[in-house]
From Swiss-Prot:
Pfam family of the protein (one): MinC_C
Subunit comment: Interacts with MinD and FtsZ.
Identification of the protein by name: Probable septum site-determining protein MinC
Record HAMAP family: MinC (MF_00267)
Biological processes per GO annotation: cell morphogenesis; division septum assembly; regulation of cell septum assembly
InterPro entries reported in the protein's UniProt record: CAP/MinC_C, MinC, MinC_C_sf, Septum_form_inhib_MinC_C
Species of the source: Prochlorococcus marinus subsp. pastoris (strain CCMP1986 / NIES-2087 / MED4)
Keywords: Cell cycle, Cell division, Septation
Length: 220
């Protein structure tokens, strides 16, 4: 599940993912003194959450002066639990849930270096190159105007050359994505797991996405 934190003027502040209501309260302690979020939206996919769990989350947020304003879920019981606590709760299909996930403004810089796992539901976008040190889990979406480099395992969706750059590429230590896109060309990830012990790179050749070994000193 994912919390979207917003300020007094409904401006986006930050989003983060968590599981089984394991929330680091120190996170809020640090955040509240710097950016003072006023409200939060909870977005859950395929998760059944009862009213007791939601009440617990609501209490944690209220202790940090954050109001749980909205719940968006594709699970009807979760929606009913939210309504029982008088929280504005909406049932949405999975594709509509994705529209509730804003991009972190800090990810709109030209070149981005992200350290850590990119979890399901997370989105990272760069106006230049995107460098990720960590794994990209299934359900995560990463994109860049230029190249995407993952120093880890790529299981999610990767989109390079989103501004029309046909020379863009996607490279990873372990390249097994759900979907690859370079410029306007889209390909489903390979059915077989990578067998080699070397990094791989996906590039465009003859309007097709091909995957080949990637050596750090090679010139593309």
């Amino acid at each position: 599940m994912k919390l979207i934190l917003r300020g007094i003027a409904n401006e986006f502040i930050k989003s983060f993912s968590f599981k089984n209501f394991e929330i680091d309260q120190n996170f809020f302690d640090k955040l509240i003194t710097k950016e003072a979020p006023a409200a939060a939206n909870l977005i859950t996919e395929n998760e059944k959450i009862n009213s007791y769990e939601l009440a617990k989350l609501k209490l944690i947020l209220e202790k940090h002066f954050i109001k749980l304003s909205n719940i968006y879920s594709n699970n009807r019981e979760t929606v009913l639990s939210g309504k029982s606590l008088k929280i504005n709760s909406t049932f949405l299909k999975i594709k509509d849930l994705e529209n509730q996930l804003p991009l972190d403004p800090s990810y709109l810089k030209k070149d981005i270096l992200h350290k850590g796992t990119v979890r399901s539901g997370d989105r990272i976008s760069s106006n230049g190159d995107l460098f990720i040190i960590g794994d990209v889990n299934p359900g995560a979406i990463i994109s860049a105007n230029n190249n995407v480099y993952v120093w880890g395992k790529l299981f999610g969706i990767a989109f390079a050359g989103k501004n029309g750059n046909k020379n863009a590429s996607v490279a990873s230590l372990y390249l097994n994505p759900l979907q690859l896109r370079i410029c306007e060309i889209v390909a489903i990830g390979p059915k077989e797991k990578p067998k080699g012990q070397h990094p791989e790179i996906a590039i465009l050749e003859d309007n097709k996405i091909i995957i080949k070994p990637y050596f750090l000193n090679q010139n593309l």
